[in-house]
């Protein structure tokens, strides 16, 4: 049976997508703002955990109160995979823009509602139950938030600037933390700790609603990403009708054909988010509860660290466009393995300057991960399953990473060893290193299932020329390999004359 050879049309200049700079800026702003609001809540919750422990879990000793409050923080991560599957399938069916508008609505309302919950003294057991329900609603919406936002930015970004553009997404995360922590410190300082415990802790959560409305306005005004529009345009009419009728996503296909990418995604997210939650969510509680600093003192140190991270974040993304994503994952993992214990030795030194230095070491390591994560993850999967695959893998990983504050607090309480969080980070560093070694480089390459994307016509011509040069090099390599095989064949014939018989 003769196989029919399929002709592939060579790529032309018209096939390179020119990204409009104005739309790109709007896309990054809208995505980063929603992400900032997500982490604003995480920041506020981490920094007021001591207050929530007393409001919702009275009667327990301070250690149990802290673990209970942080456990309430961690439980919603059990819901995130469900949100990831739900919003991921819808995002591949209806597009990224619509889903991101929905997630920010749910997230802002549920965060706002936390500030409305009465204390345990007023409604008893219903207080922690309502808190848990609000956190679960957050977890469900966040299941589609970060992955959708990272895909949105990646599909809008030029290939050569995807690392830099993607880094602004986690810039928004850190900025959200800074805002949340700053608001907590400001309110606590202005009204005093007594009033803050009584009612002041509610005020930061009320800010979520206006922030959410701003984010909704920005996201609603955006167009769908170029990559998703290309995907829909390529579909035949029957396939397009099928797309509207139901999600065209096969999770069996994702698990069987993209399992390597799933493992890379899981490993990178675990390494990044465990470090994230350890530094930015657990550390304020560690400084106040384990090292006995005042709450405001510990928060101010973390705020200073995060402000420094804001300046480093886009630099990491910019450098990753030049040197690739793999080096940052590998170097960051090695650094974390060898510096985790020294950094905690500095943090436990009881000297402010050394404490700051220890936290700064962890922050730079975290920047190495966050600087490349938002640009690396979307590049692992093709357009038609990108949201579903990424949301599923990401939220399974976050399910593990989200337990970090609770696990770290429990390890310290049960062992009375202040270095247990450092040992935990060393284990995570091994996961990060294996991920970095086995992941494929994605920098300066088109997203799977999409045409090349450029900032302007000049860059498009350069990309096209590089593409043609690569084809010529591949042809030359194939020709050389054929010549080498022919030479080996001739040698075998000379050694074994009967081989031609």
Swiss-Prot record:
Cellular component GO terms, alphabetical: plasma membrane
Location within or outside the cell: Cell inner membrane
Periplasmic side: 60-66, 120-122, 192-195, 283-298, 348-350, 413-417
Topology with respect to the bilayer: Multi-pass membrane protein
A single BP term in Gene Ontology: amino acid transport
Gene3D superfamilies: MFS general substrate transporter like domains
Function noted in UniProt: Involved in uptake and accumulation of various osmoprotectants. Allows the uptake of glycine betaine, proline, ectoine, and pipecolic acid. May be a contributory factor in the infection progression within the host.
Protein name per the record: Glycine betaine/proline/ectoine/pipecolic acid transporter OusA
